[in-house]
Amino acid sequence: MVKRNQRKKSAPKKRLTKAEVEKQRAIKRMILSVLMALLLIFAMLRLGVFGVTTYNMIRFLVGSLAYPFMFAWLIYLFCFKWLRQKDGMIAGVVIAFLGLLVEWHAFLFAMPRMLDQDIFLGTARLITRDLLALRVTEFVGGGMLGALLYKPIAFLFSNIGSYFIGFLFILLGLFLMTPWDIYDVSHFVKEAVDKLAVAYQENKEKRFIKREEHRLQTEKEALEKQAQEEEKRLAELTVDPETGEIVEDSQSQVSYDLAEDMTKEPEILAYDSHLKDDEASLFDQEDLAYAHEKIGAYDSLSALASSEDEMDMDEPVEVDFTPKTHLLYKLPTIDLFAPDKPKNQSKEKNLVRKNIKVLEDTFQSFGIDVKVERAEIGPSVTKYEIKPAVGVRVNRISNLADDLALALAAKDVRIEAPIPGKSLIGIEVPNSEIATVSFRELWEQSDANPENLLEVPLGKAVNGNARSFNLARMPHLLVAGSTGSGKSVAVNGIISSILMKARPDQVKFMMIDPKMVELSVYNDIPHLLIPVVTNPRKASKALQKVVDEMENRYELFSKIGVRNIAGYNTKVEEFNASSEQKQIPLPLIVVIVDELADLMMVASKEVEDAIIRLGQKARAAGIHMILATQRPSVDVISGLIKANVPSRMAFAVSSGTDSRTILDENGAEKLLGRGDMLFKPIDENHPVRLQGSFISDDDVERIVNFIKDQAEADYDDAFDPGEVSDNDPGFSGNGGAAEGDPLFEEAKALVLETQKASASMIQRRLSVGFNRATRLMDELEEAGVIGPAEGTKPRKVLQTN
């Protein structure tokens, strides 16, 4: 017995490993799959009694979809692993197949012979008949499974509705078989809707432009027709040889009146909508009489000058030309600009009610008792005016800007503590959507005096009121902000506002555009002294020409005995009223520099000297400057420039340092961009937040074309800077390093290639010492390649390779 037990213990049963177990399972699964496949093949081929019976049993389950069902089953048996790897493939096939079952059964019970039969009994009777007779002859729809699905669907949605439900099942199954998810589909639908909306808006704008072009063409044709009739009338006039008076016969007068009546078309009212129907002519009789009177006066002046020498004879010709050109000049109207789009800020009102409660709760959590007095919804921000309790220090509220931004889930929060003229503190919170302020809307709502030629609407305040500024009182303006913040749009708005109010003989422009693309659209308008200057080296000479004009005007004022341009022009008007010899008033001059930093890189000393001299003395001479730059650093906006350009306009900047350079205080770094600005005029101690107006390129082109159609450019050679060369000794710009370190060009190339700048990198890559590397960094900063040091932050590379 002992030996027998020992023999049993010495031969224990061997346990299979996990791999062996898995292998056995795979073998069993393969055998089962092969047997199942043979069974399905017999059924598909209907071989003998066994095949027909098996096929009818499958038909009993899925009806006439037996073949697709068996084919899908075969694929599942041999491609199981592949199907498991495809997310949603099996579920999609099952759901789509269920939809087909519903469709097939709905088709079955739409047949006349099945209309009055019970769904389950009728389906079972058809299948059982074939099963017992060992045949396959009847169409049985979706089998018993189809009957099970079809009965509740048909009860709820009828037979026709069953088709629609089955189709939805099929679509859902196909969608699950695709690699897309519901987010992809919704995103695709959203993009398609957005594209349709954009296409609709573009078509709408194109239709508007087409209508405007047709209107302008009609008005132009009417004006040409009127001019032809005027020429015809003048040709038919006869002059009395004895008295020299014009004798008009009644026939010519009648024909002229008829021609004038024919030109009174309704479209002309678009230029002067305030005129009555009987005043709808583009140039009324008073204007024509005044023009004839002036032309006669200047003709007599030319005859008087013909008795003098040849050089003097040229002057009356110029004087004669200018008044006759501008007497019939018509100012552009606001109809040239695209109409304003309606705005809906009802969403903001609901958000404001919620934010008032959040603000009070947040202050309460910090132990500060405040009350929100009012909230003003502006185009870009909402201003909450809060009243702190007695004894609450203002700086406690000012220090909570970041906490308030967190509580309100806002991009940034600007605190105005206190609001000038009020015992309240303002908290400016960005709106969920910035409402665009169009130039046309701002112009129609502004109360700018049309007599003040340089008073232009600038933007809308937080309370929605239009704010205007008079450049003559500024007297110069500095516009600064990062790229894309809205500087160029603001400059275009200022130029367009002046063009809307001033004739070419009243205001002249000198435009300097080193970028070559911002102001070039204004070329060839009659308001320009010279074509738009795009060469930075020419720009410094052009500014010097303006300085010379300023000095000449002061000498003229001294001789006449007046203090400013207004006094001089008054003297001219008095002289013209009492004398036959006419003098032309001096026009105002507006100098616009679109990128000051580029000029300072090429000729910093000359440009800075000219700007400082103009800033100190040009106001009384009627010369004003608008300086724009996207690089508000101290090497561009020097202390002397800031002292002589007291009015500032700051758009969004990247840091508080840039904001302090522009405004002498923080705040611009919290702006939102897209025209959001802080405006600090000369007569205010604190900046005002405004949303600048948007003027499109199409609007600018329309007003420019309107002006060009009336008068041609008449450039003044006295302001022409002439030709300049790169070797001109008069320039002392910082654009190169001829007298600097020999490795300057290598260091510059390294910085431009890597777009990084540090003394340690120059040490390592150029194998130089620390002192030499720091000197190279200083030279790169002076050359405008890199920005100034900002503490521990890396220096910004201002140029690209």
UniProtKB/Swiss-Prot annotation:
<keyword id="KW-0067">ATP-binding</keyword>
<feature type="transmembrane region" description="Helical">
    <location>
        <begin position="155"/>
        <end position="177"/>
    </location>
</feature>
<dbReference type="Pfam" id="PF17854">
    <property type="entry name" value="FtsK_alpha"/>
</dbReference>
<dbReference type="InterPro" id="IPR050206">
    <property type="entry name" value="FtsK/SpoIIIE/SftA"/>
</dbReference>
<keyword id="KW-0472">Membrane</keyword>
<dbReference type="GO" id="GO:0005886">
    <property type="term" value="C:plasma membrane"/>
</dbReference>
<dbReference type="InterPro" id="IPR036388">
    <property type="entry name" value="WH-like_DNA-bd_sf"/>
</dbReference>
<keyword id="KW-0812">Transmembrane</keyword>
<feature type="binding site">
    <location>
        <begin position="484"/>
        <end position="489"/>
    </location>
    <ligand>
        <name>ATP</name>
    </ligand>
</feature>
<dbReference type="GO" id="GO:0007059">
    <property type="term" value="P:chromosome segregation"/>
</dbReference>
<comment type="function">
    <text>Essential cell division protein that coordinates cell division and chromosome segregation. The N-terminus is involved in assembly of the cell-division machinery. The C-terminus functions as a DNA motor that moves dsDNA in an ATP-dependent manner towards the difSL recombination site, which is located within the replication terminus region. Required for activation of the XerS recombinase, allowing activation of chromosome unlinking by recombination.</text>
</comment>
<keyword id="KW-1133">Transmembrane helix</keyword>
<feature type="transmembrane region" description="Helical">
    <location>
        <begin position="31"/>
        <end position="53"/>
    </location>
</feature>
<feature type="transmembrane region" description="Helical">
    <location>
        <begin position="89"/>
        <end position="111"/>
    </location>
</feature>
<feature type="topological domain" description="Cytoplasmic">
    <location>
        <begin position="178"/>
        <end position="801"/>
    </location>
</feature>
<dbReference type="InterPro" id="IPR027417">
    <property type="entry name" value="P-loop_NTPase"/>
</dbReference>
<dbReference type="GO" id="GO:0003677">
    <property type="term" value="F:DNA binding"/>
</dbReference>
<keyword id="KW-0238">DNA-binding</keyword>
<keyword id="KW-0159">Chromosome partition</keyword>
<keyword id="KW-1003">Cell membrane</keyword>
<feature type="transmembrane region" description="Helical">
    <location>
        <begin position="58"/>
        <end position="80"/>
    </location>
</feature>
<dbReference type="InterPro" id="IPR018541">
    <property type="entry name" value="Ftsk_gamma"/>
</dbReference>
<comment type="similarity">
    <text>Belongs to the FtsK/SpoIIIE/SftA family.</text>
</comment>
<feature type="domain" description="FtsK">
    <location>
        <begin position="464"/>
        <end position="660"/>
    </location>
</feature>
<feature type="transmembrane region" description="Helical">
    <location>
        <begin position="131"/>
        <end position="150"/>
    </location>
</feature>
<dbReference type="GO" id="GO:0051301">
    <property type="term" value="P:cell division"/>
</dbReference>
<keyword id="KW-0131">Cell cycle</keyword>
<dbReference type="GO" id="GO:0016887">
    <property type="term" value="F:ATP hydrolysis activity"/>
</dbReference>
<dbReference type="InterPro" id="IPR036390">
    <property type="entry name" value="WH_DNA-bd_sf"/>
</dbReference>
<dbReference type="GO" id="GO:0005524">
    <property type="term" value="F:ATP binding"/>
</dbReference>
<dbReference type="InterPro" id="IPR003593">
    <property type="entry name" value="AAA+_ATPase"/>
</dbReference>
<dbReference type="Pfam" id="PF01580">
    <property type="entry name" value="FtsK_SpoIIIE"/>
</dbReference>
<keyword id="KW-0547">Nucleotide-binding</keyword>
<dbReference type="InterPro" id="IPR041027">
    <property type="entry name" value="FtsK_alpha"/>
</dbReference>
<keyword id="KW-0132">Cell division</keyword>
<protein>
    <recommendedName>
        <fullName>DNA translocase FtsK</fullName>
    </recommendedName>
</protein>
<feature type="region of interest" description="Disordered">
    <location>
        <begin position="720"/>
        <end position="739"/>
    </location>
</feature>
<dbReference type="Pfam" id="PF09397">
    <property type="entry name" value="FtsK_gamma"/>
</dbReference>
<dbReference type="InterPro" id="IPR002543">
    <property type="entry name" value="FtsK_dom"/>
</dbReference>
<comment type="subunit">
    <text>Homohexamer. Forms a ring that surrounds DNA.</text>
</comment>
